């Protein structure tokens, strides 16, 4: 990937980075373990971003 990225691409990559985190422990407690994991988790090697 190029070193110089456009602002739109940077914003999309930043959003994807934030979205890729696990859900917080307090969410599991608050929902009585109804929500256990983040279904949107993505591994950089397995899945490509359509950015």
UniProtKB/Swiss-Prot annotation:
Keyword Ribosomal protein found: yes
Family, similarity comment: Belongs to the eukaryotic ribosomal protein eL39 family.
Role, per record: Binds specifically to a region in 26S rRNA near the subunit interface.
Protein name: Large ribosomal subunit protein eL39
PROSITE patterns: RIBOSOMAL_L39E (PS00051)
SUPFAM superfamilies cross-referenced by the UniProt entry: Ribosomal protein L39e (SSF48662)
InterPro entries reported for this sequence: Ribosomal_eL39, Ribosomal_eL39_CS, Ribosomal_eL39_dom_sf
GO biological process: translation
UniProt keyword terms in alphabetical order: Ribonucleoprotein, Ribosomal protein
Gene Ontology terms, MF aspect: structural constituent of ribosome
């Amino acid at each position: 990937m190029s070193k110089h990225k456009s602002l739109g691409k940077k914003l999309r990559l930043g959003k994807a980075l934030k979205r890729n985190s696990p859900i917080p422990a307090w969410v599991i407690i608050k929902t009585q373990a109804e929500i256990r994991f983040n279904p949107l988790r993505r591994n950089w090697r397995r899945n490509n971003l359509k950015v």
